[in-house]
């Protein structure tokens, strides 16, 4: 008999709060105390660090009461274009960080928090990345904290396979993801492919620079500088939502109105 593990993925920002609430409330129901499940948190959302803390506090109480641990996948996030479209349409602040440096800094901050011995025994981690610098960072943090048995690396089949093989030589467990689609659902495979192509071609993305990655090369120097900058920023990166709309406190001054200076400006929708 093969044991099943249910893992909730994360897509748009609007699903973050409700997915977290559903995850916690479901596992609090009678009959689920001794079942484990997991969900993903996207580091490109500044809210995710606080959500990780919230889930960890809850999971530690659950574990102390005899319940099973849960699992969190710490990922970078791959739906930026969708978030940008929503932000533009509704005239809302962009929910994710608008630069990769803060994304990587938040990812490292979440990894450090999650790998504290008092946390990771209640919340096991899936460390999702193909970035050799970030993988090495997580590996060293786990060894320093003595928690290597409580996390797995996660990679996508066919991407950076030589890095995956190097990790396997260390003895650290790896979960490899591969998409599966029937002929009738092949359109979803196209969407998946486009996301992977976007990841591979982003100017600051590790995979774009991978083929030119040699010691002291331009790509090596760029990635090294980026990694060091993200380390310096990780304890200062913003935490919490970018959107703070409150209709009760807004000021409706004439000079900010719709027809000020004969220019039409659409009123943003209320973000419920």
Regions found by a protein language model. Name each.
Residues 1-258:
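Positively charged, amphipathic and often flexible ligand-engagement surfaces
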Residues 253-272:
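Non-catalytic terminal/interface segments that mediate subunit docking, oligomerization
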